[in-house]
Amino acid sequence: MLDVCLLGTAGMMPLPNRWLTALSLKYNGSNILIDCGEGTQIAMKEAGINFKPIDILCITHFHADHISGLPGLLLTMGNAERTEPLTIIGPKGLTRVVTALRTIAPELPFEIKCIELNEQDEYFEMNGYHIHAFRVKHAVLCYGYSVEIKRSGRFSVERANEKEIPMRLWNPLQKGNTVEFEGRVYTPDMVLGPARKGIKVTYCTDSRPLEHIVEAAEGSDLFICEGMYAEKEKIVKAKQYKHMTFYEAADMAKRAGVKELWLTHFSPSLVRADDYMPQVRDIFANAYLGKDAKSVELMFDED
């Protein structure tokens, strides 16, 4: 099970009932935070999300509405006597930016490990998460993120017995570990069937539409994508400032074959956003407006 909570849905500036951009993903006692805009701490408190289990922070880019909440969050983590290291992933220049933001939090009781992104696509495996960072098209260097929880095949007791594998080795093999025991090497494929469908969430904000985004989001259970503008005539502004309209996001969701789309990162000028959703659903039926604290528990398919 993967817990998803959209903490903030505002672009550019926070508004009443609309904090700046942030997304929380929780799995197996670990927490990923994607972006950390102003108000993220309040949004986390309101959603009942603990600061301590945050192991990984993914930053899309260095515009203030995506990172302005970071110094305060680091201070809160330090005041909570956190000692476990924090990994921060972000575009090239991340170390410099984090160092600058830490001016007000120079001494922390935990290590910060910065991973700078340089390539078009980069992949990481941490704490059970498979993270794909993919470059998008904004005014500055910017990345989207797909986070996947993979699922191994079913364990076959029959195959384990046929191969005379000691029962004490079944558990580590079922978890995907290779085991050496009494001079023999046992591998997971000896007892596991084909990999089963996992859970996938893709998050993309601050970009023009790209085929690269469609490819990264393909097959996602949930696609969270910016919809900066809802008014169709604002396509000119969207192109000028490298953002998207509701309809462009819906078109990408359709082409990517995702199960569900949440729109987010709304312009401060956007009001009565619900009025535009019928037209959006004409393009992609399973599209919804993101709202602060909107959450879902994504489950593995039963098979």
UniProtKB/Swiss-Prot annotation:
Keywords, A to Z, come to:
Endonuclease, Hydrolase, Metal-binding, Nuclease, tRNA processing, Zinc
Write the signal peptide boundaries: none
What InterPro entries does the database record attribute to this sequence?
A: Metallo-B-lactamas (IPR001279), RibonucZ/Hydroxyglut_hydro (IPR036866), RNase_Z/BN (IPR013471)
Q: Which cofactor does it need?
A: Zn(2+)
Residues at the active site = 65 (proton acceptor)
**What family, per the record?**
Belongs to the RNase Z family.
Oligomer status and interactors: Homodimer.
Q: What is this protein called?
A: Ribonuclease Z
Which species is the source of this protein?
Agathobacter rectalis (strain ATCC 33656 / DSM 3377 / JCM 17463 / KCTC 5835 / VPI 0990)
Gene that this polypeptide is encoded by:
rnz
